[in-house]
Amino acid sequence: MPQGRTLATYSVGVKFVADEDSTMLLAMGATVDWTSFTDPKYGTVGKRFIPAGTAVAITAGKLVVTDNIKVTYLMASDVIENPLFYRGSDDTSGLYAGGIFFEDRLPDSTAGFLAAGTKTAMGSNFVFQQSAGLLVVGS
């Protein structure tokens, strides 16, 4: 590298995925059952937003809030209830069925950790680690 120049390296892609090559995706994803997402953190009816990385289960072929009993996945994309008025996808999301993820960057983590029941429902296909900062700047 020529002297006097600085090279900055930034992490790109989904910010909670630790290793893209480790991820397993559920084939076609699933459609959101909006009646399941009633917690105020998702917003109000007609304007709800579910961020990528949210832990979900599938009931009757639709994505629902995980009950920590059914097999649990992570949403691969943001979903917005009314995409005609807001930026984002429609009512469907791809799903991560496993891989290596930054636990502290998931929207359901509290103080950097997922609930034990959620992690149990995800099974052994998911490996979690702390991000400890992602930005690497070198010269």
Task: Indicate residue ranges for each PLM-predicted region.
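Surface-exposed, low-hydrophobicity beta-strand/loop segments enriched in small/polar/acidic residues
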Residues: 1-139
